[in-house]
C-alpha cells in the first residue's frame, strides 16, 4: 500500500481537484450573468459553448469555450506544481491523467446534479496538454467540417474521430517510432526530445527533473478516453445525424429568388 501512494498520491490529489474544477459550468454562470437566462432551458438545453452561441452570440460562445478548455489546462498546471514537491509521493505525478477527470467533471458536474456539457471544449484543452499538434489538426479539420456541414456536432465528432486515428501515426505524434513505456526517458532520450517539442506541458517533467516524463502511450490513451466520452455525450446528435434531423448550427443564407 505504501508503494501505491508513493507513486500515485500526486495523481490522486490532482485528479480530485481537477474533477471539482471541471465541474464549474462557465456557460451556466456567464449566460445567467450576462443574459439572465438559464441556458438549460433554451436551445438544446446543453450547458456548453454551442448553446451559449445560441443564447448570447459567437463572442460569448468563444469565451465559454476558452474558459472550459482552461479547466483542463489548469488541472495540468496543478499536477505540475504537485510534482515539484520534493518528495517521492509527488515527484512522478502525471500531467495527463488528472486532465481526464477535469473533462469528466465538465460532463458530470457535482454542482449541477451531474448534468453537464458534451466535452468538446475540454477535449481541446486536453489536446493542448497532451500534444499541441493534435490540437492544431483538430482545429483545421473542425473548421473545414463546420464550413461544409454547418453543424458543430458533426464537425466536433468527425474532428475527434480523425485525431483518434492520426495520433498513432509516427511523426504526427511527435516520435519516429512507437514508444510504449510510461517511464522511458533514459531508454528513448532522442525520441523524447522530439516528443516533448509537441507536448509542451509534459516538457516540464524533463526540465525540472531530467529523469521522468509521461509516455506517448499514456497521453494517447488519455486522448482516446476523452474522445470516447465526447462521442458518448453526442449519442443523441449521432442519432439525429443518421436520421437527417440534426439542425444546422449556422444555417446557410437563403438566396433571393429572382423573378
Swiss-Prot record:
Residue ranges of the TM segments: 11-31, 62-82, 93-112, 124-144, 152-172, 188-208, 211-231
Q: Which family does it belong to?
A: Belongs to the PlsY family.
Q: Which HAMAP family match?
A: PlsY
Q: What does this protein do?
A: Catalyzes the transfer of an acyl group from acyl-phosphate (acyl-PO(4)) to glycerol-3-phosphate (G3P) to form lysophosphatidic acid (LPA). This enzyme utilizes acyl-phosphate as fatty acyl donor, but not acyl-CoA or acyl-ACP.
InterPro entries found in the cross-reference section: G3P_acylTferase_PlsY (IPR003811)
Q: What is this protein called?
A: Glycerol-3-phosphate acyltransferase
Question: What processes does the entry annotate via GO biological process terms?
Answer: phospholipid biosynthetic process
Membrane topology, from the record: Multi-pass membrane protein
Keyword set, alphabetical order: Cell membrane, Lipid biosynthesis, Lipid metabolism, Membrane, Phospholipid biosynthesis, Phospholipid metabolism, Transferase, Transmembrane, Transmembrane helix
- Protein source organism: Mycoplasma capricolum subsp. capricolum (strain California kid / ATCC 27343 / NCTC 10154)
Entry's EC annotation? 2.3.1.275
What is the reaction catalyzed?
an acyl phosphate + sn-glycerol 3-phosphate = a 1-acyl-sn-glycero-3-phosphate + phosphate
Q: Which domain of life is it from?
A: Bacteria
Q: Where in the cell is it found?
A: Cell membrane
Q: Read off the Pfam families from this record.
A: G3P_acyltransf
Q: Quick one: which gene encodes this?
A: plsY
**What interactions and quaternary structure are annotated?**
Probably interacts with PlsX.
The pathway is: Lipid metabolism; phospholipid metabolism
